[in-house]
């Protein structure tokens, strides 16, 4: 059975979050949490919380065994972009894009 958890509008660029999510795809949940604990990236903390949330959803809502779960699918989509402006010389302004991410993780026990 597949169980899903979402994290929306996290204030980290999707490109940076994908570096972390690519490390744990198709791994067992226990192994993924160990990898995230030892990854020195800002996005590893929210991704780890999201994986733990998906496991809690699977155990509490669907009665699945946490030891049998693995990360079936994890992907990052682009969220809304905050636009800011930085003043420059001669009355100009440069646009700064503060990007956000939506992260979705699906855990499964391998059965239908």
From Swiss-Prot:
Part of the 50S ribosomal subunit. One of its GO terms (molecular function) is structural constituent of ribosome. One of its GO terms (cellular component) is cytosolic large ribosomal subunit. Keywords: Ribonucleoprotein, Ribosomal protein, RNA-binding, rRNA-binding. InterPro entries: Ribosomal_uL22, Ribosomal_uL22_bac/chlpt-type, Ribosomal_uL22_bac/org-type, Ribosomal_uL22_CS, Ribosomal_uL22_sf. The keyword Ribonucleoprotein applies. GO terms for biological process: translation. This protein binds specifically to 23S rRNA; its binding is stimulated by other ribosomal proteins, e.g. L4, L17, and L20. It is important during the early stages of 50S assembly. It makes multiple contacts with different domains of the 23S rRNA in the assembled 50S subunit and ribosome. It comes from Spiroplasma kunkelii. Belongs to the universal ribosomal protein uL22 family. This is Large ribosomal subunit protein uL22. PROSITE patterns: RIBOSOMAL_L22 (PS00464). It holds the Pfam family Ribosomal_L22.
